[in-house]
Amino acid sequence: MRLIPLSTAQQVGKWSANYIVEKINAFAPSADRPFVLGLPTGGTPLATYKALIELHRAGKVSFQHVVTFNMDEYVGIPADHPQSYRTFMYENFFNHIDIKDENINLLNGNATDPQAECARYEAKIKSYGKINLFMGGVGNDGHIAFNEPASSLASRTRMKTLTEDTRLANSRFFDNDINKVPKYALTVGVGTLLDAEELMILATGINKAQAVQVATEGAVNHLWTISCVQLHPKAILVCDDPATMELRVKTLRYFQQIEAQERQQYQD
């Protein structure tokens, strides 16, 4: 696992955006061979989306031959609801880049048969072979997407019951009223994430520090979904300074030294 310790959330956004652009451009996607990108919602990736939009406007990257799959969607709220993840993605990213609408893949939280919708989504992912890079965030309790604590590390896309902690955390988007937060969501599984060629998790803020510590220094544990990054051959954890506060000094210095050497080698 690679851990990128940075100072601020803004730096996390810029670093992760530049990494995505590097990967897309190195892949040199085409209509017949698109780059497949997994995407999250929430507050953490907003800085990344902002930086990606700026890089696109500067002519540094095109999304014409990029196919996206989003991590999750609430069940039971209209697609055009202000807090649907479809609305979030279009307002904060898709409307500002040159991605083709047919290349955007989002879970349908209003499907009459949620199980069939999840199977369709998995099949669509597999039709592209694999996701080249899946970016995600992490919750205070270590969840990734809506893979809540005790999710199977082999799980696939499915419907999940949201914990009270998750609904309480998300109530800030629903007038601070937990009763307005949906109780269910469709989400890619942990196994779906682990199938990606690369997995990049963003963690910012002191409230993510315990999750970062468990992911980096703890054992693989289904009660902490974030620990699954230890099972991935190409996982990256990009953190700001507050998110590393629970790490041992020796651990943090190790990763700082590794990244300093990487930068020096790149400059040489």
From Swiss-Prot:
PROSITE patterns tied to this protein: GLC_GALNAC_ISOMERASE
Annotated site location: Part of the allosteric site: S151, R158, K160, T161, Y254
Record-linked SUPFAM superfamilies: NagB/RpiA/CoA transferase-like
Active site: D72, D141, H143, E148
Catalytic activity of the protein: alpha-D-glucosamine 6-phosphate + H2O = beta-D-fructose 6-phosphate + NH4(+)
BP term (GO), one: glucosamine catabolic process
One GO molecular-function entry: glucosamine-6-phosphate deaminase activity
UniProt xrefs under InterPro entries: Glc/Gal-6P_isomerase, Glucosamine6P_isomerase, Glucosamine6P_isomerase_CS, NagB/RpiA_transferase-like
Cellular-component GO terms for this entry: cytoplasm
Inhibition and activation profile: Allosterically activated by N-acetylglucosamine 6-phosphate (GlcNAc6P).
Metabolic or biological pathway, per its Swiss-Prot or TrEMBL entry: Amino-sugar metabolism; N-acetylneuraminate degradation; D-fructose 6-phosphate from N-acetylneuraminate: step 5/5
Uppermost EC category: hydrolase
HAMAP family per record: GlcN6P_deamin
PANTHER family: GLUCOSAMINE-6-PHOSPHATE ISOMERASE (PTHR11280:SF5)
Role summary: Catalyzes the reversible isomerization-deamination of glucosamine 6-phosphate (GlcN6P) to form fructose 6-phosphate (Fru6P) and ammonium ion.
Subunit note: Homohexamer.
Name of the protein in question: Glucosamine-6-phosphate deaminase
Organism field: Proteus mirabilis (strain HI4320)
